[in-house]
Amino acid sequence: YPVLESVKGQIENAYKILETCYENGGKLLIAGNGGSAADSDHIVGELMKGFVKRRPVSTELAEALKQADPERGEELAKKLQGGLPAIALTNHTALSSAFANDVDGMLSYAQQVNGYGKAGDVFLGISTSGNSENVMYAAVTAKAKGLKVVGLTGKTGGKLAKLADVAIIVPEQETYKIQELHLPIY
């Protein structure tokens, strides 16, 4: 994707942040709206299981599974895969609807960052404009809790680009074109 050459450095910086997070036992929290919510879910699907090649569980876990239940443990040891911890904040309908009803729906992602996030984790905010308020509230909460913030945006990068530790601002203006360029990045 030659069009992404201009954001190569930002992609590499985001990778380094994620690598450090995972090396230190952290997790990735992801949020977006509409197509960006779908991207959030897609990213989790790729990280929590093998992608391109199988990720076997550790020998220690395989043995513990067999010890816990020799019959099922053998199957689990063969079929489970190592995952990189990631949570799409877009999928918790009961929590989101209860928080929207009882408190403020705009803060649903922020509430989840508050509940799940810890220093050393990473928040990935996906917003084609960089100005989605609910994503911004989550990003502010993440920063306050000591999480690194990565923004995946387009256009000018918006408010999210200014707050993020790393902002990947794809060089497009139209929403569907921005979303098309987000896909090869993740």
Where are these regions (language model features)?
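Short, glycine/polar-rich helix-capping loops at beta-to-alpha or helix-loop-helix junctions
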Residues: G151-A164
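A charged, well-structured terminal subsegment
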Residues: Y176-Y186
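Short beta->alpha connector loops at strand-helix junctions that form conserved
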Residues: A110, S127, T153, I168-Y176
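Short glycine/serine/threonine-rich phosphate/pyrophosphate-binding segments
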Residues: A37-D41, M106, N131-A138, L160
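Generic N-terminal amphipathic, Lys/Arg-enriched alpha-helix
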Residues: Y1-E5
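A short, well-structured juxtamembrane/interface segment
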Residues: S6-N24
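Glycine-rich, small/polar surface segments that engage phosphate groups of diverse ligands
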Residues: T20-Y116
